[in-house]
From Swiss-Prot:
Keywords: Sporulation. It is found in: Spore core. Pfam families: Tlp. Induction: Expressed only in the forespore compartment of sporulating cells. This is Small, acid-soluble spore protein Tlp. GO terms for biological process: asexual sporulation; sporulation resulting in formation of a cellular spore. Belongs to the Tlp family.
Length: 65
């Protein structure tokens, strides 16, 4: 028998994911300041994707609330 689909804490888990992504974004931003141009470009591209993820996660949180 499959496990029941318990989504009662989805919003909380999503919020935690948002915070972790923000933390990673900030750490990467600090690292980029000390990196060479090639690495800095890669970090900036990844941070752009992180911003998109944060927007998506926040939208999901709204849907869950």
């Amino acid at each position: 028998m499959p496990n029941p689909d318990n989504r009662s804490d989805n919003a909380e888990k999503l919020q935690e994911m948002v915070q972790n992504t923000i933390d990673n974004f900030n750490e990467a931003k600090e690292t980029a300041e000390l990196s060479n141009e090639k690495d800095r470009s890669a970090i900036e591209a990844k941070n752009q994707r992180r911003l998109e993820s944060i927007d998506s996660l926040k939208s999901e949180i709204k849907d869950e609330s």
